Amino acid sequence: MKPLRLKMQAFGSYGKETTIDFEKVNQNLFLITGDTGAGKTTIFDAIVFALYGEASSSLNKKEGVVLQSQYVDFGCEPAVELAFAEGSGENCEIYTVRRVPRHLKTITRGAGKGKQREITGSVSLIMPDGMEYPSKETDRKLQEIVGLTKIR
């Protein structure tokens, strides 16, 4: 599995939409550097979250609402989108997975106006042929494609 593009919005330390294009790198090694708190771990959390539905760091116990950025208001939907390639040469296939974590959203109308309510997360997987894979089976399919579980 080779990551091609990672897009994050309102996710972890990334408030505004941020895209990392791994294809711009023409080397076999990609180095992620930065100051403490700059968002390096969030990049790995986003990749693992896209593939497995939970953050990479089990020590941090990051899941759901905790993944929602504190740098945007509750009206901005947190999301991660990862485009990745599987295989090589003529057998290379490109997949795109998009996950929205469980998050809080501000109610804008009615009796609960101004309060937050929890929104259920979602996932979609676009196959190489452009068709969307059934969301109920996406986690299993991603493990099959990548060949690894989160623990491995």
Stretches found by the model and what they are:
Residues M1-I145, K150-I151:
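Extreme N-terminal "head/tail" segments of very large remodeling/mechanoenzyme assemblies
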